[in-house]
């Protein structure tokens, strides 16, 4: 079975190789196809170049506008009053944390005072 597969593969390879080596017999037909192909590609090439340059310009301009919008947004953030709100919130959080710490410390001091026996009335 393996030899049959090998023989079939070898025959297929020979057929493909012979078709690559056999040139077209009609030289007039080849020159006519060449002329038609060259006529088709000549006008398309400048159009492709024009489209490429327009695409490049559009891409660069889009990147510029995107950068400009980002800069304007950052400037707006700097000038807005939202920074003050965040600062006040942060100050309030700090004050609240300090108050909680002081209350915990006062509770610990009170418990240690009670343990020492100073809180008893005799």
From Swiss-Prot:
GO terms for molecular function: glucagon receptor binding; hormone activity. Pfam families: Hormone_2 (PF00123). Induction: Produced in the A cells of the islets of Langerhans in response to a drop in blood sugar concentration. One of its GO terms (biological process) is response to starvation. Residues 1-21 form the signal peptide. InterPro entries: Glucagon, Glucagon_GIP_secretin_VIP. Keywords: Cleavage on pair of basic residues, Hormone, Secreted, Signal. Its main location: secreted. PROSITE patterns: GLUCAGON. It comes from the Eukaryota. It comes from Lophius americanus (American angler). Promotes hydrolysis of glycogen and lipids, and raises the blood sugar level. It is found in: Secreted. Residues 83-86, 122 form a propeptide. Belongs to the glucagon family. Gene3D superfamilies: 6.10.250.590. One of its GO terms (cellular component) is extracellular region. This is Glucagon-2. The keyword Secreted applies.
């Amino acid at each position: 079975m393996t030899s049959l597969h090998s023989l079939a593969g070898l025959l297929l390879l020979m057929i493909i190789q012979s078709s690559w080596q056999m040139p077209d017999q009609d030289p007039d037909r080849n020159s006519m196809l060449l002329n038609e192909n060259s006529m088709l590609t000549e006008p398309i090439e400048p159009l492709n170049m024009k489209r490429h340059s327009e695409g490049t310009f559009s891409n660069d301009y889009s990147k510029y506008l995107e950068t400009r919008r980002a800069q304007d947004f950052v400037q707006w953030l700097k000038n807005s009053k939202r920074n003050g709100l965040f600062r006040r919130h942060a100050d309030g959080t700090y004050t609240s944390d300090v108050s909680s710490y002081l209350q915990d410390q006062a509770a610990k001091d009170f418990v240690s005072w009670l343990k020492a026996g100073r809180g008893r009335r005799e």
